[in-house]
């Protein structure tokens, strides 16, 4: 059974690119959201296995959204993505309620699977 993914990013172009890439690599993209409120609502309704979550959203930051997702009855795994480097966020990634971080330029199914397998940083 394919891994079910919700993509959350305020840029439609990245959501489209990520969808194509992940579908081509065997993931089931069950939905998209463009902001934090939409992410929490969609995760509750769609119950994805993983949420691919932009760190900088128009209405909130990804760390706060990740914390809200962790409080859901069936919390998904959360992987943060950003156009910035992981080092720009310091230890916030390590202390966050997430599986880890992927730089947007490094996004691939293999990297996502690596993080879901337990590694905190794949790029």
Locations of regions flagged by a protein language model:
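His-Asp phosphorelay/catalytic-motif detector in bacterial-type signaling
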Residues: 2, 47-49, 73-77
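Acidic catalytic/metal-coordinating carboxylates
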Residues: 35-38, 61-64
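Hydrophobic/aromatic residues positioned on beta-strands within the core alpha/beta folds
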Residues: 81-82
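Conserved sequence signature across two-component system core domains
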Residues: 8-9, 33, 51
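Short amphipathic alpha-helix used as the core "switch/output" element in two-component signaling
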Residues: 63-74
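Two-component/phosphorelay signaling modules centered on CheY-like receiver
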Residues: 12-31
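As written
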Residues: 62, 93-102
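The feature encodes the CheY-like receiver
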Residues: 58
